[in-house]
Regions:
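Conserved small/polar residues in nucleotide/adenosyl-binding loops
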Residues: 295-302
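Extreme N-terminal starter segment of soluble prokaryotic enzymes
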Residues: 1-5
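A nucleotide-sugar donor-handling region in carbohydrate enzymes
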Residues: 113-176
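Active-site and donor-binding regions of nucleotide-sugar-utilizing enzymes
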Residues: 7-16, 21-28, 39-131, 135
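Short internal beta-strands
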Residues: 35-41, 195-199
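Catalytic binding pocket for nucleotide-activated donors in carbohydrate/polymer assembly enzymes
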Residues: 243-285
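Acidic donor-binding loop of glycosyltransferase active sites
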Residues: 230-241
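Donor-nucleotide binding loops and adjacent catalytic segments primarily
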Residues: 153, 159-231
């Protein structure tokens, strides 16, 4: 079988999005290819997720560039997913004889890859690529985990009344955006259930809210996340892979951005009317209650 080497990391600094979507791609391809995942310092959660999909190799962080290159024989397909893989690093992989796929949210470098996947952009003119590079752009190329692909096939009925809310701002959420929006949601008089999905590294900036309607959950499987989103009347999240997963489940989504690489995707979501816009959630200026109420009124006018 043809070999595919997947290269992606996760951490409190870069989040888990790169790792999750690349592993989702490995899961899609594992029956037809010999897949191996390469990553630095995996957490117990990452290990448990990789073990469900394919073999994995742990790289040493201080030498991961050279260590991964030395593992290549030249007959592999390589999938890279992170912002720090430069054009020169892409070229080094290509010079080995490998076929190269880059998964990226940005378009800030020249690509020598054979394929570039970017679900957050639809304009090919934004990309600096080789003549042979194939661009796979837009939602049709979103790398969703299996439970979300299955949820997308089912017809969902969106409720006008917001009673169940899920809040998810990544595994680390160092800015405690979760805490801010939990407090916002508690002001919605119709809400009777709030689930805040957090990671092991999450540390609230103030004492956690004590409210019978609120529960914190962590280490959710893909199936548990899909079930939660399908059961929620509103999902509040960042303009990231989580947002795509929530939309795939048919949920009403309120989303914002807090790092630069999310801004263009956020603008795409807004321009298509797919989300309730929350703007820059590190400097929140949108009142959630007003935004939800306004969207509800607009929906009934059209």
């Amino acid at each position: 079988m043809k070999k595919i080497y997947f290269r992606a990391d996760a951490s409190a600094t870069i989040g888990y999005g790169h790792f999750i979507r690349t592993l989702a791609l490995a899961d899609m391809l594992k029956d037809d290819f010999d897949c191996t995942f390469f990553t630095c310092h995996p957490t117990s959660y990452q290990v448990s997720e990789m073990e469900k999909v394919c073999p994995f190799v742990t790289l040493q962080e201080e030498a991961h560039y050279d260590e991964f290159l030395s593992s290549l024989q030249g007959d592999e397909i390589v999938v890279l997913d992170n912002y720090f893989f430069t054009t020169d690093y892409q070229r080094a992989i290509k010079q080995k004889g490998c076929r190269l796929v880059c998964v990226d949210d940005m378009h800030d470098k020249h690509y020598v890859a054979d394929v570039v996947i970017n679900h957050g952009q639809t304009n090919p003119a934004l990309f600096d690529v080789e003549f042979y590079t194939r661009l796979c752009l837009g939602f049709d190329w979103a790398l969703l985990r299996k439970p979300f692909l299955e949820a997308a096939k089912r017809k969902s009925i969106s409720s006008d009344r917001i009673e169940k809310v899920a809040v998810c701002f990544g595994g680390s959420d160092i800015h405690d955006i979760t805490g801010y929006f939990v407090n916002q949601v508690l002001r919605l008089c119709t809400v009777n259930s709030i689930t805040a999905v957090v990671g092991d590294a999450y540390t609230p900036h103030s004492s956690c809210v004590q409210d019978s309607r609120l529960v914190y959950r962590s280490r959710l499987t893909a199936q548990e996340m899909a079930d939660l989103f399908c059961d929620s009347d509103l999902v509040i999240c960042s303009a990231s892979s989580v947002c795509i997963e929530a939309l795939a489940c048919g949920a009403k989504v309120a989303a914002g951005w807090y790092v630069d690489n999310q801004k263009e995707f956020y603008d795409l979501l807004i321009s298509n009317g797919w989300i309730i816009g929350l703007g820059n959630v590190r400097q929140p200026s949108v009142d959630l209650c007003n935004a939800v109420s306004y969207t509800h009124l607009r929906a009934h006018e059209t």
